[in-house]
């Protein structure tokens, strides 16, 4: 969440920055509530001071033997206490109302982020590789997988429903090989520590990384929700939409020594998403699933290091695509297409031949201190007493299913067989083709 000081001292400037990403900040309501809060805060402090002062007078009156005066002051103190209690209740209600508003406010965009309304306004930064040309009719990954029986959508529908997949044989092994290759690359060459984390997380974890309270409907929960979808019961466990949630929450409510930063962590997990807002989109194939695997990259840094860390983390995701020899492009998301908690995001989009377009395969984001403030994730500089908020970053390195789509379609041959990328062959027992 944003620093509350911005909503007090720099309200108009903050509203202008949020307007860049199409978020209409209700300045007048916030200003009115803040004025009431300040007035009530002063009243509460004055009542507290007066009650303390009058309480001392009770003892003084008793010392003088004036019990009648002592009783009168005692009654006065009782009335002051009741008035103070009511003022505290009202103040807490005002603070809660302000906090509710604050929770709904997205992060401020970095100055380098281009203005725009949606994905059409994202700006291409670079391209790598050249899409192949084929002298035969290109098949999509669904046809390629079903030809050999390696992808079984029908069984998945029977078992679970739409947007699920059953993989068999060499296709299942390829899926596993992709994830293992990514983990080995990130741990052995990029310096990340591999993590094994829970796939079910609590309310505080989802709040910390920003999925709650705003995006409760996008999650799968282990117990029924209340009538309002965003009001997830505090004891509910939810399936992770991304390993970003459990991995980033490793630093929740902790103070890290400066010397330990940056923290670089990676995890391979399944991810679960309801795709509530995606009805009718990408209904064919592996592009948009309720359950999919992903290798996640997370970095925890000092504030002054986070922008350089974003470039590094994005480069680590790019390296996967380069070693797999998959053509891709890198784009910077515009203000209207950024995620709720992001200050700056790069998307990597891989070439998908059957669609003749680039599709997102990784999003790499710098959250600044937006998540850290929610999580109270801090660090302490050497020689300093007061801790500071860390900056958090995350990115896909990569989405395993979409990587498999790209390999199947880009590496297809005329007979429907798939050439296995050289770097994956050791993970496939030396197999060079499947299908």
From Swiss-Prot:
Could you tell me the superkingdom of the organism this chain comes from?
Answer: Bacteria
Q: Which UniProt keywords apply?
A: Aminoacyl-tRNA synthetase, ATP-binding, Cytoplasm, Ligase, Nucleotide-binding, Protein biosynthesis
Return the SUPFAM superfamilies for the record. Class II aaRS and biotin synthetases, tRNA-binding arm
Output the Pfam families linked to this UniProt entry.
Seryl_tRNA_N (PF02403), tRNA-synt_2b (PF00587)
Q: What is its EC number?
A: 6.1.1.11
Supply one GO BP term.
seryl-tRNA aminoacylation
The reply to whether tRNA processing figures as a keyword in the UniProt entry is no
Report a single Gene Ontology molecular function: serine-tRNA ligase activity
Q: How does it assemble?
A: Homodimer. The tRNA molecule binds across the dimer.
Free-text function comment from the UniProt entry: Catalyzes the attachment of serine to tRNA(Ser). Is also able to aminoacylate tRNA(Sec) with serine, to form the misacylated tRNA L-seryl-tRNA(Sec), which will be further converted into selenocysteinyl-tRNA(Sec).
Q: Write down what this protein is called.
A: Serine--tRNA ligase
Which organism's genome codes for this protein? Vibrio atlanticus (strain LGP32)
């Amino acid at each position: 969440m944003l620093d509350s000081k911005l909503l007090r001292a720099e309200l108009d400037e903050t509203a202008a920055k949020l307007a860049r990403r199409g978020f209409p900040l209700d300045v007048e309501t916030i200003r009115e509530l803040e004025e009431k809060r300040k007035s009530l805060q002063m009243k509460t402090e004055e009542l507290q001071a007066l009650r303390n002062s009058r309480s001392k007078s009770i003892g003084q009156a008793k010392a003088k033997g004036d019990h009648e005066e002592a009783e009168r002051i005692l009654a006065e103190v009782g009335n002051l206490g009741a008035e103070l209690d009511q003022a505290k209740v009202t103040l807490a209600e005002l603070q809660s109302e302000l906090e509710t508003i604050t929770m709904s406010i997205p992060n401020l965009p970095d100055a380098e982020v281009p203005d725009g309304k949606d994905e059409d306004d994202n700006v291409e930064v670079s391209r790598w590789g050249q899409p192949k040309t084929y002298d035969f009719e290109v098949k999509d990954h669904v046809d390629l997988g079903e030809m050999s029986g390696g992808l079984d959508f029908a069984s998945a529908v029977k078992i679970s429903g739409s947007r699920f997949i059953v993989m068999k044989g060499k296709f299942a092994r390829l899926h596993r090989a992709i994830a293992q290759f990514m983990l080995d690359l990130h741990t052995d060459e990029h310096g990340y520590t591999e993590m094994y984390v829970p796939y079910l997380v609590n309310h505080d974890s989802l709040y910390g990384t920003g999925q709650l309270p705003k995006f409760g409907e996008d999650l799968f929960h282990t117990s029924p929700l209340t009538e309002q979808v965003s009001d997830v019961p505090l004891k509910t466990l939810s399936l992770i939409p991304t390993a970003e949630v459990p991995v980033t929450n490793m630093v929740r409510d902790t103070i890290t020594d400066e010397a330990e930063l940056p923290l670089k962590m990676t995890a391979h997990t399944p991810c679960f998403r309801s795709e509530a807002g995606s009805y009718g989109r990408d209904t064919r194939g592996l592009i948009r699933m309720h359950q999919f695997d992903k290798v996640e990259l997370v970095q925890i840094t000092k504030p002054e290091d986070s922008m350089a860390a974003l470039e590094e983390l994005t480069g680590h995701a790019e390296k996967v695509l380069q070693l797999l020899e998959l053509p891709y492009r890198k784009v910077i998301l515009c203000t209207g297409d950024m995620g709720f908690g992001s200050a700056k995001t790069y998307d990597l989009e891989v070439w998908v031949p059957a669609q003749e377009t680039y599709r997102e395969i990784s999003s790499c984001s710098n959250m600044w201190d937006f998540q850290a403030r929610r999580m109270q994730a801090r660090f302490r500089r050497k020689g300093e007493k007061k801790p500071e908020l860390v900056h958090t970053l995350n990115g896909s390195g990569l989405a395993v299913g979409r990587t498999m789509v790209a390999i199947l379609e880009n590496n297809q041959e005329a007979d429907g067989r798939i050439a296995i990328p050289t770097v994956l062959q050791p993970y496939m027992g030396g197999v060079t083709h499947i299908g």
